[in-house]
Design a protein with these regions (language model features):
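...the same signal can extend to comparable exposed beta-sheet modules
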Residues: 1-196
């Protein structure tokens, strides 16, 4: 069986070793359930081994899950100076000689040894009608899984403030936008929600 079919069909050995790799400083072990049933491309795979039963035994992914970076909101971009919210507070950051081609809005941050090594925007988004039980629902009824660690930003008095997902589930806002790292069929999840 082909590795892509094995993952899509959930044929993963019980003792499979799966690692998602971003770079030499950023990588993590992945549980089989995180990728089982998703659609891989060969460009998502750095290395793999199948066992004699045709099950996936070893897999090194090429930054496939999207779980290796942090997600937040860029609130200001001026040259190599940035303001962003990852946790509860807005933080200023200067990248020195390195300039990232980004704009204000939803973003990912690659962080190694406590230092930001890359910033990029997340452009894939969906307008959400409701949020319930860790799922965002679009106007057409399509469901989008929301990451357990999704960041929620609600505009209060003209500024975005960090909230928790349960705050959206208690009160659905008239405008809610979910930003996802990639199509859900490929393991993508909503990582950031903005609301007002």
């Amino acid at each position: 069986m082909d590795v892509i079919d094995a993952v899509k069909d959930g044929k993963i050995a019980k003792d499979a070793k799966i690692i998602d790799y971003y770079n030499a400083d950023i990588y993590a072990t992945v549980l089989p359930g995180r990728i089982s049933g998703t659609t891989l491309a060969y460009s998502d795979i750095k290395y793999y081994e199948m066992n004699d039963a045709g099950e996936l035994a070893v897999l090194i992914l090429n930054n496939y899950t999207g779980d290796l970076v942090e997600y937040g909101l860029l609130t200001e971009v001026k040259g190599s100076s940035y303001k962003y919210i990852l946790g509860e507070d807005e933080v200023s950051y200067n990248s020195g000689d390195v300039r990232y081609t980004v704009s204000e809005g939803a973003a990912y941050f690659a962080v190694a040894n406590g230092q930001i090594t890359k910033i990029g925007n997340i452009s894939a988004k969906v307008s959400l009608k409701t949020v319930a039980n860790g799922t965002g629902y679009a106007e057409n009824g399509k469901a989008y899984a929301i990451d357990d660690n999704a960041r929620v930003y609600i505009r209060v008095d003209g500024e975005y403030k960090a909230f928790e997902l349960k705050d959206l589930e208690k009160q659905n806002y008239s405008t809610m936008t979910g930003y996802y790292d990639k199509d859900p069929a490929y393991g993508g999840k909503i990582r950031i929600i903005t609301a007002y």
